[in-house]
Structure formats: C-alpha cells, structure tokens
Amino acid sequence: MKWHKFHTLGHTMSLFRLLALSFVLLMAEGDAYSQLRKGSKREPLINEWGIGYGAGSPFGATEWRSVKNSEFTQKFSQMWQLNIGHQFTSKDYGAAPKGYYYPTLGMFFQWLDYSHLKIRGVEPIFPKRKTADFGQIATFGITLHQYCWTSGKWRGYLNHETGAAYVFNPVYEVPSWVTLSKPWQIFVGFGWFFAYEIKGGEIAFGPQFTHLSNSGLANYNTGINNFSLSLRYRHKSIREIQKCKPEEALIEKDGRKFKSHFYGSVMAGYGKVYFEDPNSAVQITIMADAMYKIDPNNGIGVGFDYYHNDNPDRTDRQDYIGAGIKYDRWFGPFVIHVQVGSYLNGKRPIKYKGTARIYENVGYKYVMFRHKPISPYIGFYTKGNGFEAEQMSFALGCTFH
C-alpha cells in the first residue's frame, strides 16, 4: 500500500487591519495519508491533538480530531475538524468596546495541496528528521459564537426595537455576559508552513492570510482581511499504516501549466462599499490587472491594476490605479490571488492628485478552462485601503495567459 505524509498549518483568522494588534491564535492543521494501492480497502486513521499560539490573531483554541482519508486525487486531500476556543477584541471596533470575550465553536474544511512535495515513505512511528517540509493550504469554514464576556469597563445590551446590535453606555460595570446579534463568521484563507518532525509529533510554523465575511461585531460585520504567524505542536498516533519503499512514495511537482510568464484579467460585476458608508448603493465595478510571474504556474510576481467604480453616492472614489506585488496559487480550476502595494485615487473627472495609499486586493476565482490561453471565470474579490476591506464584489471576467 502506498501512502503519503504531508503537513498543514492552519488557523482561523487574524486582523491585518492594524499590525500592532496582538492576539491569541487558533491553528488548525491536519495530516493525510492517501493514494492506496488498487484493490486495497484499508485506510489509515490518524488521531491527533495539539495546542498552538500565534501573534496577530483574535482567535485561540485547542482541538481534537480524527481524520480518515480516502483517495481524493493525487494532489489533494480533505479534512473536517471541530474547534472549541475563544475570541476577544483588543481594540474598540465600532460599538464593540475593548476587552470583550467570545466563546466560539467552529467547523473547518481544509483543501490540502502537497503536489509540490517529494513525499517520502517513512515509518509509522515518526523518526527524527533534521529537514523541514514546506507546504501550502487553502482553508474555509465557519465559527459560531453567541455570547460575549464584558471586561467590566462598559455596559451593553441588545436593542431589538431599533435593530442595533448593541447600545453601549460609558458606565463602569462588573464583568457580565451579553448576546451577539451576528454569532457567526465565514472565512476563506491560504498560507504556508514549515513542519519539523519530532518523535511522536510535529512542530510547525508559518504565516496565514484570511478573509472574514462577518466579524460578528456590531458596526464591524463586513469583510476583514487578516494575517497571522503561527506556531504549533501536534501529537500524532497512527493505525493501520503499511510501509512502502521510499522510492515508491515519491511524487514530483507537476510541470508548468502555462507557456507564458504573463497573466492578466479583465472583469465587470456588482459590488458594495463598506466601512465609510455601510449603506451606500450597490455599484458597478470594472477592473483590469496584469502580472508578470517568476513561475508561470504559481508564485510571486509584480503587476498593476485599474478599477473604475460607478456609484453616484461616492463621487470621490471613482477611479484607482495601483501597482504592487502579486501572488497566485492554483487549486485545480480555482485560483487565489493577493496583491499588496500602493495606489492613487482620483475624483470625477479623473485627476490623480491624492497621495499614494497602501492597499490590498484579495480574489477567489473559478476559471472555466485553466489551461487555455483565454478563459472566462466567475469570482469574488475584496479591495482594501490600509488593510481595511472597503469593497467586496462578485464578478464575471476573462483571464489571459
């Protein structure tokens, strides 16, 4: 029976909005052993527990899970896991004051890519190894939290008549529980990790980038783009694992998917602007971007983009032009791209007199014909100013390779 080992370093979420924030982190990762021999019905069962800590995240937890993997593809495996933890704010966000604590319950699904690794055949009891594995993951999931614990500095209650999530009075009060009006979060993310094996377990470290669609806090319930660094220890026990020769377990990285280092796309769709005017009208967005990548298949490159937002309620934010560093990562027909740089914004008519501002753009696309030079796609993206998500859009577009 052939089987593979690879590592994942997961997360939940973390606020990239202010780099000075420091939070406790949940990291969610899993192992997978797959690609069984033809005709074999035996599958390995991996039991794990672990605990982790990180800087830059509002979520911390311990979790336990069992993972049973069947043959998914030669590149990917999947894992469900349940996490129980906590979340708290370290800064005032809208109506939610500093020091609030949220118990959470979350379910996560990870799509794990190990096509870039040279998988080794190893003993069921993990030996010490001085080399570190490097990998990437894509993650999405949902967290649930219904109550929040006050720090004792503020008093709050749920106002059902006005529809407001909270009404806070600046009166000192003993710590107490209040109910959240939006007790859920959905997030999508990706990241990298280094994993170093020790006997019976693993130590892993790496960054994670995440987009949250709902923070669960009043007046702060729109898109948030986050970044975290995580450190994790994992204990592992494995059953029903058959050994195989190391040379039988090797998987080489796929060849290049595209002939060109150039990548570009155009799109048009409907979006909505948040934070500065949460009640603003839905707007039409047109975007074009181009990128030169060192690796034509996946990797880091440089590029520029242009946005036009047609919204009569926001005449001061009609056109943007920017340049920065881009990163693309493919998962089958899905691609996740991130760009960080600076942009100039102009008023109508277009006059780029504003100062350059830090911005980021995160996108998730489903490309119809990934290996074709030109292909239509459907996608979702957010554009942020100073790492605050200002705009979220669904769109139809076309890619060029």
Per-range role (PLM):
Residues Y53-F59, F109-S115, T162-P170, I198, ...:
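Transmembrane beta-strands of outer-membrane beta-barrel pores
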